[in-house]
């Protein structure tokens, strides 16, 4: 529990903290009060006291509570509306495979529930009873499909599809990457420390997200050692195919001439801060223009760049709701599991905006 100090009013300077008692000069508490409450005395002796009021933003608790209460039900219906349009591969010979749409439904819904395969069996039975799927998929079959490489492009398309209901809402975007832990470890012998060292491996996800609703509009999964900078052009281009992009914010790791050009090519303005050793010359007119804007209009630049912090909220939303690690053991299964987390997150954002903004989910069958 923190300590409480008694401060005088604006008419005098005093504080009961040990720092003020010892030095008899302004302590941090007095400075804090003066920054919040200022006193001005004019020539006639009139005193004007100005108090700084912190701006607060109200929460639409009514619609938020409603969306939370019906989230699971609407999630299942929205997901079924997407997966029911997935066609199974043509049957040729051998034992018929499980319906692909039902299998993808079970994969995404299992990640949403964060249960093990066996405990998730009850949810699949309920989904079949509500006619959201045609066949209940055994959990071992579902795990086998997580390992299929040909499902990865389909899941990426589902990420894009689930973001489309918000294409009229989002115009400013941010890009960043985040890691998801795995159960795999790597070991090596360190000659410096004279012992074997082990560390947990993780999967890196590169996101483009809208700064208003935190919807993910572009995603790419790579290994933990891949750099962030080269991934921006592809993700921005994919987002621009469905969204009217006005701004793209990113941290210094994405600073390069190629990235600035890629953002300009889609009609957006880049807000990427320059490094301390960056120079204005040598990289073309676009680089020079953005460098001078950053240096001469830094306050205005930071007002736009601050939107980048919303992608940190996106990362937190995904990890806190659907887990910050993956259960799968193989690389392909880990990639597909992370993509399922992103699909779950997008559907959650769509459900939230259905109640707060009144949008419609056009991908429902």
PLM segments and residue spans:
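Short, hydrophobic/amphipathic alpha-helical patches that form generic packing surfaces
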Residues: 29-36, 102-113, 340-349
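Basic, short loop/linker segments at the boundary and entry of helix-turn-helix/winged-helix-like folds
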Residues: 59-112
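Short, basic interhelical loop/turn and adjoining N-cap
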Residues: 93-98, 115, 125-143
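Polybasic low-complexity intrinsically disordered regions
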Residues: 95-96, 104, 112, 122, ...
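Helix-centered, glycine/charged polyanion-binding patches within enzymatic domains
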Residues: 252-253, 257-320
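Basic, amphipathic alpha-helical segments enriched in Lys/Arg and hydrophobic/aromatic residues
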Residues: 297-365
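Structural motif
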Residues: 92-101, 196-197, 329-338
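Long, low-complexity, compositionally biased intrinsically disordered regions
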Residues: 1-63
């Amino acid at each position: 529990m923190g300590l409480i100090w008694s401060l005088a009013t604006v008419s005098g300077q005093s504080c009961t903290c040990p720092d003020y008692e010892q030095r008899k000069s302004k302590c941090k508490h007095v400075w804090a009060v003066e920054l919040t409450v200022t006193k001005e005395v004019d020539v006639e002796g009139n005193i004007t006291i100005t108090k700084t009021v912190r701006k607060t933003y109200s929460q639409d608790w009514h619609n938020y509570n409603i969306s939370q209460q019906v989230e699971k039900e609407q999630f299942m219906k929205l997901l079924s509306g997407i997966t029911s349009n997935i066609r199974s591969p043509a049957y040729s010979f051998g034992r018929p495979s499980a319906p692909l749409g039902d299998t993808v439904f079970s994969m995404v819904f299992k990640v949403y529930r964060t249960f093990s395969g066996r405990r998730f069996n009850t949810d699949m039975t309920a989904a079949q009873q509500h006619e959201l799927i045609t066949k209940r998929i055994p959990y071992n079959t579902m795990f086998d499909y997580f390992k299929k490489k040909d499902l990865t492009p389909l899941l990426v398309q589902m990420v894009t599809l689930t973001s489309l209901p918000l294409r009229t809402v989002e115009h400013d975007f941010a890009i960043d990457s985040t890691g998801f832990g795995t159960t795999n470890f790597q070991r090596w012998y360190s000659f410096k420390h004279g012992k074997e060292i082990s560390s947990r491996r993780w999967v890196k996800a590169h996101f483009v997200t809208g700064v208003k609703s935190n919807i993910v509009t572009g995603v790419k999964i790579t290994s933990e050692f891949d750099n962030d900078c080269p991934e921006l052009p592809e993700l921005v281009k994919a987002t621009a195919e469905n969204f009217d992009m006005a701004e793209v914010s990113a941290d210094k790791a994405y600073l390069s001439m190629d990235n600035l050009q890629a953002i300009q090519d889609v009609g957006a303005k880049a807000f990427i801060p320059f490094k301390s050793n960056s120079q204005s010359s040598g990289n073309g007119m676009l680089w020079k223009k953005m460098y001078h804007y950053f240096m001469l209009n830094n306050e205005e630049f930071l007002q736009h760049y601050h939107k980048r912090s919303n992608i940190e909220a996106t990362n937190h939303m995904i990890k806190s709701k659907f887990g910050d690690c993956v259960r799968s053991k193989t690389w392909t299964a880990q990639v597909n599991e992370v993509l399922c987390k992103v699909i779950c997150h997008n559907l959650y954002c769509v459900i939230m905006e259905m109640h707060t903004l009144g949008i419609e989910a056009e991908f429902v069958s």
